[in-house]
Amino acid sequence: MTMAEVDDIGVVVVTHRSVETIDACLSRVRAATGVAAIRVVDNASDDGTLAVVQRHAACDARLRFVANPDNPGFAVACNQGAHALAQPQDASWLAFVNPDCLVETDSLARLRAHARQLDGNALVGADLVGEDGQRDPAARRRDPDFAAMLRTPAARRLDVPVDPARSLQQVDAVSGALMLLSRVLFERVGGFDGAYRLHAEDLDLCRRVREAGAVVAVANDVRVVHVRGVSSRSRPLFVEWHKHRGLWRWFRKFEAKRRSAAIRAAVFTMVWGRFPVAAMRALLRP
């Protein structure tokens, strides 16, 4: 068996009301090359998600699950899954896969190959596309600059254009829907910040990976379908609240210290002033 064929990837899938896609997600993860172990962490689903997970676990010894009695948030659950992979010492790579991501057989192995080219000192994401083939703008992002957002609305766009000349494109951040990094790097940066309940935890992790001297990049040659928003449709207000809360936390953690009191107050007003409008749009969304 060559290095490219070694099964040393531990996959973490966090679910919450994910019954629409979890069967397809796990079927594809189980068929993926290089997977040594799979850990599903369910955050108190009440829609039959756990029954689907249990069925997969019954026929694949690599798959085990944690059933949380409540919903501690995505970041906490990701850390739980990574911790649950501590025993299989052959899972030297960690892949965090959303339950609405449909990987191809070679997707994870190819992400691992890209990370290996950077001596494992990298966090790598995929070229995410919707079911309609449209690219997910969250797959390639720059860090938020909230002071710039106060000056011009255009600065609120975080997406970065794809560079077709590069198979591996360095960016500030990739989407948490699918990311792969070495266990060593994950532990070096302390994993996910569990204070994020939902949204911006991926921006935070990518920022700390870069601050640790590692590379964040998206593999433009690894395309994966991401059926966005499956879990969030049932709780639009909850999602919008924590999206805004996550952005405010990111600002306080990484940007606020170098901004004046006036700028900090203006950013607070901008972030939370936008929440009622975003919440109304979410409620009216079909």
Where are these regions (language model features)?
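Active-site-adjacent helix/loop segment of glycosyltransferases
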Residues: 204-285
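Glycine-rich, basic loop-to-helix element that forms the pyrophosphate-binding segment
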Residues: 67-88
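A conserved acidic beta->alpha catalytic loop
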Residues: 42-51, 70
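Conserved donor NDP-sugar-binding/catalytic core segment of glycosyltransferases
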Residues: 102-137
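Short, acidic, metal-binding catalytic loop of nucleotide-sugar glycosyltransferases
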Residues: 27-36
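Short beta-strand-to-loop acidic/aromatic patch adjacent to the donor-nucleotide binding site
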Residues: 89-102
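Short, flexible, basic/aromatic active-site loop/helix in glycosyltransferases
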Residues: 143-172, 176
